[in-house]
Amino acid sequence: MTPSNSLSSSERSLSGECSVDGNSCDRGIEDECSSHSSQEDVELTKEVKVDRLERKSKSMPSDILDILDEKSKENSVENVQFLSDREDDSDDVPVWEPPEPENPEDEVDGVFADDDDDCCDGSKWNKASLLGELSDESSEKRKVYEENRRVMLEEADSKFKFIVSQLIKSAGFSIEESGYWFEIVARLCWEAASMLKPAIDGKSVDPTEYIKVKCIATGSCVDSEVFKGLVFKKHAALKHMATKYEHPRIMLVEGVLGHPISGFSSLQSVNQDNEYLLKYVKPVVDIIEASKPDVMLVEKSVSRDIQKTILDKGVTLVFDMKLHRLQRISRCIGSPILSVDSLSSQKLKHCDSFRIEKIVEEHNAAGESDKKPTKTLMFLEGCPTRLGCTILLKGCHSERLKKVKEVVQYSFILAYHLMLEASFLADRHTMFSTIFAKEATSCVVEIENFSPSPSPRESPSEAVDIPVSNGFDEQTIQINGEADGEKVGTWESDGDHVFSHEPYNPVIFTGFSSLSARLSKYLGFVQNPESVPVSVDTDVSTTSNLDSIRESEEDTAEKNEDKQPLLLDPELPVNSSSDDGDNKSQTENDIESTLESQSILVLVSKRNALRGIMCDQRHFSHIKFYKHFDVPLEKFLRDMFNQRNLCQTCVEFPEAHLYYYAHQNKQLTIQIKRIPVAKGLAGEAKGKIWMWSRCGKCKTKNASRKSTKRVLISTAARSLSFGKFLELSFSQQTFLNRSSSCGHSFDSDFLHFFGLGSMVAMLSYSQVASYTVSLPPMKLESSILIKAGWLEKEFQTVFTKGISLFEDAAGFLKRLRSQFTNSDLRYQRARKLLSNIEELLKHERCIFEENIKNSFDKAKTIDDVSHRLLRLNRMRWELLLQALIWNYRLQSLVLSDRLLPSSDETKIYEQGLKTVSEAGMTRYENDNKVSDSGSNGGIDTPLVEHKDIPIAGASVGDNDQMAESYVPEDNESQTLCSSSPDTTSPINNHFDTHLAVNVHSTNGQEADKSIPVTGESLDDEVSTSNGPHILGWDEWFWLPFEELRSKRIVDIEKEYLLKFEYVNNFTQENLQTVNQIITEESSRLRISLRDDDFIVSDYEDELSSLIACALAHLNNEESKKPLSRCIHGSLQGFLDNNQDSKQTDRDVSRFSSESTNRLETLPPPEVLVTFGSVKSVGKPKYSIVSLYADDFRDLRKRCCSSELDYIASLSRCKPWDAKGGKSKSVFAKTLDDRFIVKEIKKTEYESFVTFATEYFKYMKDSYDLGNQTCLAKVLGIHQVTVRQPKGGGKEIRHDLMVMENLSFSRKVTRQYDLKGALHARFTATSANGEDDVLLDQNFVNDMNKSPLYVSKTSKQNLQRAVYNDTSFLTSINVMDYSLLVGVDDENHELVCGIIDYLRQYTWDKQLETWVKSSLVVPKNVQPTVISPIDYKTRFRKFMKTHFLCVPDQWCDQGDS
């Protein structure tokens, strides 16, 4: 808790009474890298002399000045300066230099002294004694100081009375009883707290050890009193002893006096008797004669003969006092406790009076005739020190008094807390009041964006938001801005009872630690009363009638516009149903729980700032207020200032360290510094401790920092519990939230200082960024984000290709038109036909532009990004369809007779039929020769190789008879020209109709070409169902494009495209854009999801798209009929058209045999899907094996929005160059960033098969039972085999795992891969460090340097999930898994999930463990790979230790 030895036990011990070190058991895991250097530093530093107090200045690292929340210079430890004014830094006052005192006479020794233990002038201990005559100015300041203290105490008293009234009511007293007991309890507790003065050094600070409550069933209630002394239920040893003394001398004896003499017999010798007297009796007689006590109090028993000896000496003896009672008496009267073994003469202390009195408890009598019970009490009154008193309760039966006793015990603690806090806050006000008098205009604000709060005139509303604390919950009321402030608007409360426990619990009651607006206005904290919190409890301190309290509370609901009840604290919600029994019971429980909450849990650490090492690892310290291991504020500061308290880790002085205390969203940083002796503070010999504050962000016009004057801390403030001081620091104080006259916050912008002599402690407060731990979600969200501009770019590419297609076709038509001169009447019909086709081209171009615009608009509005990608595939299909139909249309014009003259026109010419076309048209003659008749140059068709190019790829339901092309018989063929019917070669009937022609090239060479026939006989069955055709032609490709577009893709492929499977060199030479589109898109798969607007396609370099195609096919098959399942069953939806059954069987058996041999067990259920065509030039063939398809589908039903969404996400992916991955292995993310596709090792593939059943059961139980888990969900295991067409059909197999992306929809700035091991787990970061995956040692180092705190709830959830998952992974013999932690600074989240949990602890890993343990890693250090049980233990311990949790709630006594 502190750097001193006196508090070391508080930091380390595991005690429910005093301190809880939440991570004590985990601190065995040390930073291995830093530990070696740290040990070297320790060895070197041990040579430093302990008594050397003056240190040479050392360079201070920048992180020391970071706590000042401002840019600063790196300077020596002696001269830390703010970098406030870069133009004139030399004039800046050092931040450590103490300002002038608020009262100069405080610096004069003997002018102002606090009461000491020997002061018995009757003044209250928490007030100052004025010694000597003070100047008029000092007297005036003292009057103001005392007035401030008086107002503080009055405010505290008003809050105290309200709590007492609630406690009495909760004790079950009637209204009448509550009335008089309320006044009595409040008076007694406040009087006792005012009188008590616990010692600071060497004695307990627990107030309950200085006060006792005794119940005496006699007299009346008003006779109850605070007895200024001690009362015990004891009597004198012998009845003849005196029972009353004035100023008696009291001797305290520990142990047993004398020895029992019952063992002596009549035969014992006189020598034995004398020996007993000399050994036991004589020392007692000697000490009595030397010290002359009046009263002897002995811890244990006293022998009979010694009792008589003491009686003979005229001394009153009381024995069986118990040691703790003697200690209380010793503390109060200042007399030592003597040991029976070493009784010696001592100067005994005395009290004012001693008496033993028998009291008749008439209220305990059962009836009037019964004997009234009596009680013998021993009174020690008027002790010389105010270190103990007793509250005597009288006036009713003992059972009733016991209830009052409980109320008194609680109330006294509250009163004591309040009194010390009031004194401390009064001192702080005195300090801050020295800065209020200065005008805000004297300050030069250095914050560029600083904007002062609006004035009352600029306030948008007269209603004021008032934070009201009920002790646990920060609530808000609105009070209309009226002058009297009596009307209350709306109370906003989450609870119906008096005390609410969530979410913030300043210990005991925040109301005690908060100033009301009335007090704030009086003290001058409020500069704009209409914009600051105010309080409603204006008359609390003047009311004592409890009946009026009850009546006022009952009438609150009906009279909410009337004045608030006098004792109704504004910080408690109004409960209109307080008479309800359940609410009453709940209120009592809440009050009891509240009063037991007397502690604070803080995260404590200590760091050597000069060396940059952690001397005290972060751990929890449970500080119970005013208990044994708590210390007063004065002692804490003295231990800080004691330069002889060397750090046990680095053997350095406290001055070299930074001390951190974190709670909820705040962190307190303490730094110690020795200032020059010349500038030291006065009164060090007298123990005077000063405090002051200085703004860290501004300067006044004379270039000095805005600073308060320093004030002397009062005795009561020095006695404040350090734990309570932390509570005041971390709770939201009204005046700390106010801005100073310079416009800066006292809380966040001011530095606070305490000083004693030449030692100064600087305290700075900063906000703690608390992170939440985000575990893998049970339900995966659909992606709504995609890389900016990517979709637009892809649509733009499709659009550009489409425009090029239409321009390519238009250019061809233009060249074709040029072949028909206007003067030649024979081609008038051709020119008209070409004009109509050009109009058709323009029309379809407009339609295309409109369609792609509409599709893009729809894609942008789709919520799921993956569906946008599917809509893009739809546009690619339409682009391909557009290219195909214009290819066929233009070829049909060239190769048919529609552009040739009619038979009547040909008779005009005597030379016979010759068709000339420079656009590449051919003329067919009887000798099967084609000549070029165009003098202007036609469309050349050079000789090229025969190529088979699939138009639309293989599709579901392809017929084997369509696999190969053929040329029909003579009677089925159709020539290009009606006069040449014998130009084709006969081929077998069973093939599709094709025309084989000899094409003469321009160089006279001859080649055999396959050209699709477009005759009418081919389209007989199609034309009957196609409806109206363009230009009256009945070929399918002359149908309107909108009509074709509306047809199902499968229907178009089956009915049209498969009958025109090949294209010739015509397209390659004359329609290059069309040829490019057909080449790129024709071999691509197209599988519809739901409808043809969403299409899944395959992309060769994106393996996830192959998986998506396979899953889409299986999904479509399942929607049609139940999917047959068997081990190694195959579904060949995308089979090679010419693949024979032998090849298929061979593939299936290959997978079967490999799986069986590898797994050595029954092979898992597999679904095999193959697709790809060997006729596709350069197109590989694929086969996909999906393991446990049904089980994975069931898992995806639980965690994914739908199966279709999952498939859509996998449809596109991008390579992901994640650092730390295996080289040449597949590692990709889906384009919507939702999933990760990772290639796994063969051993991992085999391991998963062995525990897959347990995995699915564990995940099912997690969903059904709601168990916490942080396993990154594996949603599919697929084996993708790629058979390349080149290189002899070489096969490449990829074992792929589909896993959720933990960093989905988050901006992760850095990632850690944590295995719980530190050896060889450090990686050097790159220049930018964005994509680096850091390891365990990096995480430990970063947590020490710049910790990332998590909330208590988040850490509990993480630990619970880690516990569940590691237990499961150990049960299936898995180790070497990692916790992936992504830091999202924008959302303040730590994204966590366990990954890489497919590797079992097989014999090869066991061998690796043995080798590394024996030969590689240092002694007593574990390698990364160890047995699953040891791995689980180490993994859990690391996560518990290094995830730092800031306490977000105040602790009660049960939190130990």
From Swiss-Prot:
Its EC number is 2.7.1.150. Its cofactor is Mg(2+); Mn(2+). It catalyses: a 1,2-diacyl-sn-glycero-3-phospho-(1D-myo-inositol-3-phosphate) + ATP = a 1,2-diacyl-sn-glycero-3-phospho-(1D-myo-inositol-3,5-bisphosphate) + ADP + H(+). InterPro entries: Cpn60/GroEL/TCP-1, GroEL-like_apical_dom_sf, PIKfyve_PIPKc, PInositol-4-P-4/5-kinase_C_sf, PInositol-4-P-4/5-kinase_core, PInositol-4-P-5-kinase_N. Residues 1-110, 533-592, 925-944, 967-987, 1003-1022, 1137-1159 are annotated as: Disordered. One of its GO terms (molecular function) is ATP binding. Disulfide bonds: none annotated. Residues 1115-1443 form the PIPK domain. Residues 86-110 have a biased composition (Acidic residues). Residues 973-987, 1150-1159 have a biased composition (Polar residues). CDD domains: Fab1_TCP (cd03334), PIPKc_PIKfyve (cd17300). The keyword RNA-binding does not apply. Residues 43-57 have a biased composition (Basic and acidic residues). GO terms for biological process: phosphatidylinositol metabolic process. Transmembrane segments: none annotated. Component of the PI(3,5)P2 regulatory complex at least composed of ATG18, SAC/FIG4, FAB1 and VAC14. The PI(3,5)P2 regulatory complex regulates both the synthesis and turnover of phosphatidylinositol 3,5-bisphosphate (PtdIns(3,5)P2). Catalyzes the phosphorylation of phosphatidylinositol 3-phosphate on the fifth hydroxyl of the myo-inositol ring, to form phosphatidylinositol 3,5-bisphosphate. This is Putative 1-phosphatidylinositol-3-phosphate 5-kinase FAB1D. It comes from Arabidopsis thaliana. The gene is FAB1D.
